[in-house]
């Protein structure tokens, strides 16, 4: 992933079935300069959005109807266009086994709910390599 100049715009796909949690994530990530956020309400909607645009990072819940976040991670890692896109898992599933499974499937970071905005912001900035 090439380094970008200061004013570059980054794009983030948030995949989360809870409207309240989506709103919280959008609000938190609004503090990241030059980050454009797109929302999807489940894994299938997320894949639809991924098919029509490129994203620099994906933030996804695990427990969602239709297609869960782990299946989404698997599908993204199998897609030549997005296979290297950083993925942040945000979930209530906090066990060591759940974390290991998500990371083995290809997630880059794992944050348990309740989320703290500074942690989400720091994780996204770190994965995008922006200040």
Which residue stretches match the model-derived regions?
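C-terminal output helix
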Residues: 115-124
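Receiver (REC) domain active-site loop signature in two-component systems and cognate sites
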Residues: 64
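Acidic, metal-coordinating helix/loop segments flanking the phosphotransfer/catalytic sites
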Residues: 39-57
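Short, conserved "switch-loop" micro-motifs in signal-transduction and mechanochemical regulators
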Residues: 79, 93-94
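Two-component/phosphorelay signaling modules centered on CheY-like receiver
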Residues: 19-38
């Amino acid at each position: 992933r090439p380094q970008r100049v200061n004013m570059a715009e980054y794009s983030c796909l948030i995949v989360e079935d809870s409207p309240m949690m989506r709103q919280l994530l959008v609000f938190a990530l609004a503090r990241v300069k030059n980050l454009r956020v797109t929302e999807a309400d489940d894994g299938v909607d997320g894949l639809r959005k991924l098919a029509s645009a490129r994203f620099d990072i994906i933030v996804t819940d695990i427990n969602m109807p239709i297609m869960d976040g782990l299946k989404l991670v698997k599908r993204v890692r199998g897609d030549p266009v997005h296979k290297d896109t950083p993925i942040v898992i945000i979930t209530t599933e906090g066990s060591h086994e759940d974390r290991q499974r998500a990371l083995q499937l290809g997630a880059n970071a794992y944050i348990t709910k309740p989320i703290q905005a500074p942690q989400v912001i720091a994780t996204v900035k770190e994965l995008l390599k922006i200040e």
